[in-house]
């Protein structure tokens, strides 16, 4: 329990510091299965946005950590408004049980990102129509 609280407190401290330095939360949600949690934020200085989604459970084989990643790898997916999406190296969590649930069949839009969720997967794209599809069994980028 102490470890979980430390992770939550460190994550909240990170986001509080980030927001104080010119970032603003532009939206968040979780899937009805509570397996995927997503958040997007805007850099008010650079006028760009970023989005990340984190999975709780994956049944597919997770790629090995990149050589430059000594933290957790494989369960976090991120992208900017433009360009490719990728798996992330991270040492905290974005999962928050208080995120609003995005119901199956519904679409979420914010900051140039569009996500839709079905019973089979979550699909998110950016302004370039690049992004990812996530499910327990398959995580793919396009």
State where each predicted segment sits:
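Extracellular glycan/ECM-engagement signal in secreted proteins
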Residues: 116-142
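N-terminal secretory signal peptides
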Residues: 25-63
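A low-complexity, Ser/Thr/Gly/Pro-enriched, surface-exposed linker/loop concept
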Residues: 50-102, 134-142
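Acidic, glycine-rich flexible loop segments
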Residues: 90-125
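Positively charged n-region of N-terminal signal peptides that target proteins for export
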Residues: 1-4
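Processing junctions and N-termini across compartments
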Residues: 14, 32, 47, 62-63, ...
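Sec/Tat signal peptide C-region and signal peptidase I cleavage site
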Residues: 15-22
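Bacterial N-terminal signal peptides
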Residues: 6-15
């Amino acid at each position: 329990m102490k470890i979980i609280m430390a992770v939550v407190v460190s994550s909240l401290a990170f986001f509080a510091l980030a927001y104080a330095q010119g970032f603003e939360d532009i939206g968040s949600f979780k899937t009805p299965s509570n397996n995927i949690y997503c958040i997007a934020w805007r850099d008010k200085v650079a006028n760009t946005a970023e989005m990340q989604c984190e999975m709780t459970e994956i049944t597919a084989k997770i790629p090995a950590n990149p050589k430059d990643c000594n933290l957790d790898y494989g369960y976090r997916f991120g992208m900017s408004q433009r360009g490719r999406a990728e798996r992330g190296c991270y040492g905290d969590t974005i999962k928050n049980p208080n995120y609003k649930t995005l119901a199956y069949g519904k679409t979420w839009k914010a900051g140039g990102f569009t996500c839709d969720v079905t019973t089979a997967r979550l699909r998110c794209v950016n302004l370039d129509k690049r992004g990812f599809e996530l499910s327990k069994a398959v995580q793919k980028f396009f």
